[in-house]
Amino acid sequence: MPRSLANAPIMILNGPNLNLLGQRQPEIYGSDTLADVEALCVKAAAAHGGTVDFRQSNHEGELVDWIHEARLNHCGIVINPAAYSHTSVAILDALNTCDGLPVVEVHISNIHQREPFRHHSYVSQRADGVVAGCGVQGYVFGVERIAALAGAGSARA
């Protein structure tokens, strides 16, 4: 039986360099820090009666391990894989082990308006939704979508 937001947190995963939000390329990513993003996610989940498990790593294998953990203990995944979006078959394969678990991919910038190599995302092949170009508010949209999907009891409602 799918886990609901009422009994399992949303896993929110952040990939490489997102620990530098607010410092790195603010003209692209804005001035909000990762702590600001976490606070937004906590508030958004709480509005739906839920909680979040918010993490960041610069290491692909650690993100894969956390995805494996999420498939057992969480009601959904919001993931900003950052640069791994364009390169990581390992993250795609890990997400593909999460049968029935809703996944939303988030990008702060609009990856389709950037360099051509950023236009393709492996993660999008598994994601139930993709949010790009909405700034850090995209994370709120991701949390809200997971809340809707987890509340409905179906990853692909």
UniProtKB/Swiss-Prot annotation:
Class of enzymatic activity (EC top level): lyase
Enzyme Commission code: 4.2.1.10
Name listed for the protein in its UniProt record: 3-dehydroquinate dehydratase
Annotated consequence of substituting residue 24 to K: Reduces kcat 2700-fold. Reduces KM for 3-dehydroquinate 4-fold
Positions bearing the site annotation: Transition state stabilizer: 24
Chain's role: Catalyzes a trans-dehydration via an enolate intermediate.
Xref: CDD domains: DHQase_II (cd00466)
GO process terms (BP): amino acid biosynthetic process; aromatic amino acid family biosynthetic process; chorismate biosynthetic process; quinate catabolic process
Gene Ontology MF term list: 3-dehydroquinate dehydratase activity
Pfam family, one: DHquinase_II
Recorded catalytic activity of this chain's protein: 3-dehydroquinate = 3-dehydroshikimate + H2O
TM stretches of this protein: none
Binding residue positions for substrate: 80, 86, 93, 108-109, 118
Gene: aroQ
tRNA-binding keyword on record: no
Subunit note: Homododecamer.
HAMAP family (alphabetical): AroQ
Active site: 29 (proton acceptor), 107 (proton donor)
NCBIfam families attached to this UniProt entry: aroQ, PRK05395.1-2, PRK05395.1-3, PRK05395.1-4
Pathways involved: Metabolic intermediate biosynthesis; chorismate biosynthesis; chorismate from D-erythrose 4-phosphate and phosphoenolpyruvate: step 3/7
Similarity section: Belongs to the type-II 3-dehydroquinase family.
Keywords, alphabetical: Amino-acid biosynthesis, Aromatic amino acid biosynthesis, Lyase
